[in-house]
Amino acid sequence: MRLFFLFFLISQSFYSQELNCKVNINYSSIPSPNKEMFNSMRQGIYEFLNNTNWTNDLFENEERIECTVLIRIDQQLSTDEFSGSISVQSSRPIFKTLYNSSILNIFDDQLRFKYVEFETLEFNENSHFSNLTSVLAYYAYLIIGMDYDTFSLSGGDPYFLKAQK
């Protein structure tokens, strides 16, 4: 048992997810909002983006791609259906400086999705589970593709193709 636990810890130290994404949900347009549900939504999206393995590459914690996702909820159409907008930004450090350079800055005002409180956000690149996870996966692959393009010509192409699925 100790050997298994040690192996698990060592394997986790060598493998890290690709994104270090901050997530914010703005629901100020919703009258009498269920704050716990929106906090659960924010946490679920945060875990989905930051804990999913989007590539087969190994990332150290300090190599993770910095990004921000802001979802503004304009309408709650039903208990589990929402419409609003999403803003996605990513940046990367400039070599041998203390500065970051903006890589991606997108605003989409046509976001519509369903979310059930405490429901796990699942992803399989060959299946469609929900509009929310598909949109988030699209932007995750776009962020990764843009970041890989900063290292080599067409380096992000495989991730742009995954985003198109």
Predicted regions and their residues:
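Sec-dependent N-terminal signal peptides
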Residues: L3-S13
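Acidic/His-rich structured neighborhood in mature extracellular/periplasmic domains
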Residues: S83-K165
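Start-of-domain marker
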Residues: Q17-S83, I94-K96
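Alpha-helix initiation and N-capping motif
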Residues: R2-L3, A137
